[in-house]
């Protein structure tokens, strides 16, 4: 039971997890940066009595919300008169719920057979928040065989928190690419996330990127993640958004795209309300995502401030996904890791400089 559920239970306010939170619990999916959906039998007044820093976003799934100021878990609260109410969202799967006190699931729409096989089949369902809900479930579950998903048009307006939740939750799913392709087909990406949409205009050379253009490459890279860490996933998603705005120079087709992309990514994340820490970390990884490939060939001491940064380990994961998505094999990545490990070993050795030379030999030449 989460601290939020425990707080409400102690106050005598009944609550259940529902929708994606209940589905994740059933499937054993754990998010590193969780956003919990809670069904509350009470009012926002009851919530305000128990939580400081409560906000009221007036979203289809959130009468009230808590950010990370309250702890590691963000929460979105939907207030109802009775916990047994149905039609909580636009899709039947959103009615799936779990009692956090005893861990029991409640399935008023008889969806267990599909969930058991990790299948998502919305049929012809639709509604105000259908695009949001469909994208989230597509990031977790497999589409039913031969199913044609109804693609709703993008909303006429999309609040920053709604977009931030959508992006954060999709990226913490195993099937992120399926959800992003769905959003692309709906026109949402083109309307709201234009920097991502511009990747469709990036045409890669087939010998370097047999997986396809900018969009296909990015979706392929997401599939190589070892974890669903939100910050690393954001960096992978946005690592090439500078390419549509870069120019060829001295044999480099997308010259300075990393620097451009870092600025665009920071602007995008700030506009959605991501924390300064996440924004800065993502911008750092995008700015330097080309560096690991050069480590075996350059004096690493020249870029020691970057390599010694605590975020460089995460940067190597971004590089691995970027490199593996091109089907080149692991050789370049392993060579970069070997160079990095050698540098770090020498950096800790008091008898050698950062390039591995014995310091006594260096001093003898002076």
Task: Give the positions of each predicted feature.
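Catalytic cores of the polymerase beta-like nucleotidyltransferase superfamily
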Residues: 1-366
